């Protein structure tokens, strides 16, 4: 389900006519070469298209207008090969409505001491041309990104690639539609928020639906469709009957698959890319969606439990940014406070994303007291090890805030035979005590998105693009 348009990024370089036509042709040739080699590097997830050498305010303004109305263009990359008077960039930059990357680089990565002359100096002026251009962006309070270094170096290309993913996620953020099945968990504070402001700032549309609307769609799913999904499930996961008799086990799994197909069809009909559930709102449903939710999250839908639409929308954005790679809905569940073992055990009742599994997930059926419904099927697995980030978004009186930190993710020290859920252990890199204290001081909630694929820098870049306050704990 996670499909993204074939976006591209338009690349322009700044100059001025006083250098002469031959020099401007040389500037264009160098810029085209950079674009070609960036594309050939295999590093960039989206194509860079060199458009032109920008020499006048009129050409820059017209270019930015063209960027805005081309839906296949996700953003702009600029470079000042020579000195480009920055007043020329004011109007166009103010009109730009898409992400902007200033690539502060130089065509050649060395100083040719034996051959350097004023012709070379006049043509290779990035050292001060990029400063002139950066000044006007700072003066205009543009939420742009600056990547500094030689364009041919892998670390610079990696930075551009990561920014491209953020820029695409920004564009796709304005297409995020969240279907709320039921309301938020009663009397919970942090899952609330200003939906109008969220649509203005991040583009997130949030709509409420009664459970009866969803149940009607679920009941339309045929046995034949469930049979097909059951066979697919058997091919991908380990089916564990456990203490259940065969008929009870199969029925429970089939109920979840019926929910999976019903929810998916409901979302597809409405163009929704994320959803929430709430164990307090289950009218007409045999089970709380567990396996159903996990399969939808696996497919790329954003998800939030207990009506948490902010985390659902954030999850969708992060899945786009990460190409749906090891990025999962999570909750801080319980703690290990022993000296030398400090850690958070993250989980949820049923809905943790199998993209972070380190082992082959098992389809199991167990009782769940919360919700008061029949025993739900769910995927049970252990999370992964490695560097990751944990991020949340909360709403305050003065706007939205993104809170996050880097973590060391690990597998639990032991088995949990009496806790048949998906689980992930982690410790904030700043330490559990510091991390937890600063998280709570910042007002971070208990629902988060954990990602092994994304970086703090990328999430900070996204927050900057949408004008969100940032509180990253370092």
From Swiss-Prot:
Its EC number is 5.3.1.4. The keyword Ion transport does not apply. Mn(2+) binds at residues 306, 331, 348, 447. It catalyses: beta-L-arabinopyranose = L-ribulose. Binds 1 Mn(2+) ion per subunit. Its cofactor is Mn(2+). It holds the Pfam family Arabinose_Iso_C. One of its GO terms (biological process) is L-arabinose catabolic process to xylulose 5-phosphate. Pathway: Carbohydrate degradation; L-arabinose degradation via L-ribulose; D-xylulose 5-phosphate from L-arabinose (bacterial route): step 1/3. InterPro entries: Ara_Isoase_C (IPR024664), AraA_central (IPR055390), AraA_N (IPR055389), AraA_N_sf (IPR038583), Fuc/Ara_isomerase_C (IPR004216), Fucose_isomerase_N/cen_sf (IPR009015), Lara_isomerase (IPR003762). GO terms for cellular component: cytosol. It comes from the Bacteria. One of its GO terms (molecular function) is manganese ion binding. SUPFAM superfamilies: FucI/AraA C-terminal domain-like (SSF50443), FucI/AraA N-terminal and middle domains (SSF53743). Keywords: Arabinose catabolism, Carbohydrate metabolism, Isomerase, Manganese, Metal-binding. It is an enzyme of class 5 (isomerase). Belongs to the arabinose isomerase family. Catalyzes the conversion of L-arabinose to L-ribulose. PANTHER family: L-ARABINOSE ISOMERASE. This is L-arabinose isomerase. It comes from Levilactobacillus brevis (strain ATCC 367 / BCRC 12310 / CIP 105137 / JCM 1170 / LMG 11437 / NCIMB 947 / NCTC 947).
């Amino acid at each position: 389900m996670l499909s993204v348009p074939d976006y591209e990024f338009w690349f322009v370089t700044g100059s001025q006519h006083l250098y002469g036509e031959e020099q401007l042709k040389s500037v264009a040739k160098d810029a085209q070469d950079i674009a070609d080699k960036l594309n050939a590097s295999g590093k960039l997830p989206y194509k860079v298209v060199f458009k032109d050498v920008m020499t006048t305010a009129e050409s820059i303004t017209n270019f930015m207008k063209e960027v805005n109305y081309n839906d296949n263009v996700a953003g702009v990359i600029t470079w000042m090969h020579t000195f480009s008077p920055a007043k020329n960039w004011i109007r166009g930059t103010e009109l730009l409505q898409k992400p902007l990357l200033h690539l502060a680089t130089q065509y050649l990565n060395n100083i040719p001491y034996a051959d350097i002359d004023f012709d070379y100096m006049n043509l290779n002026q990035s050292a001060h041309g990029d400063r002139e251009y950066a000044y006007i962006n700072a003066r205009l309070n543009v939420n742009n990104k600056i990547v500094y270094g030689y364009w041919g170096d892998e670390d610079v290309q990696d930075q551009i690639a990561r920014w491209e993913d953020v820029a695409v996620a920004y564009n796709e953020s304005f297409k995020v539609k969240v279907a709320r099945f039921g309301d938020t968990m009663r009397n919970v504070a942090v899952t609330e928020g200003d939906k109008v402001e969220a649509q203005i700032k991040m583009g997130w549309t949030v709509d409420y639906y009664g459970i009866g609307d969803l149940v009607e769609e679920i009941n339309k799913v045929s046995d034949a469709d469930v049979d097909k999904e059951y066979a697919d499930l058997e091919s991908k996961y380990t089916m564990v009957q456990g203490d259940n008799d065969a008929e009870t086990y199969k029925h429970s799994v089939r109920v979840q698959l019926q929910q999976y197909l019903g929810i998916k069809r409901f979302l597809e009909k409405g163009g929704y890319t994320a959803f929430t559930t709430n164990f307090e709102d289950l009218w007409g449903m045999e089970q709380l969606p567990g396996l159903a939710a996990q399969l939808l999250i696996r497919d790329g839908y954003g998800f939030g439990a207990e009506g948490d639409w902010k985390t659902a929308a954030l999850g969708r954005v992060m899945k786009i940014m990460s190409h749906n790679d090891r990025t999962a809905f999570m909750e801080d569940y319980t703690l290990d406070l022993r000296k030398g073992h400090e850690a958070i055990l993250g989980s949820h009742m049923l809905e943790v994303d199998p993209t972070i599994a380190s082992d082959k997930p098992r389809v199991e059926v167990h009782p769940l007291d919360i919700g008061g419904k029949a025993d739900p099927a769910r995927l049970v697995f252990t999370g992964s090890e490695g560097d990751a980030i944990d991020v949340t978004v909360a709403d305050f009186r003065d706007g939205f805030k993104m809170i996050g930190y880097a973590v060391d993710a690990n597998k639990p020290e032991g088995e949990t035979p009496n806790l048949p859920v998906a689980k992930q252990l982690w410790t904030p890199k700043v330490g559990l005590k510091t991390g937890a204290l600063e998280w709570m001081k910042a007002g971070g909630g208990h629902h988060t998105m954990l990602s092994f694929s994304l970086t703090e820098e990328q999430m900070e870049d996204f927050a900057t693009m949408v004008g969100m306050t940032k509180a990253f704990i370092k």
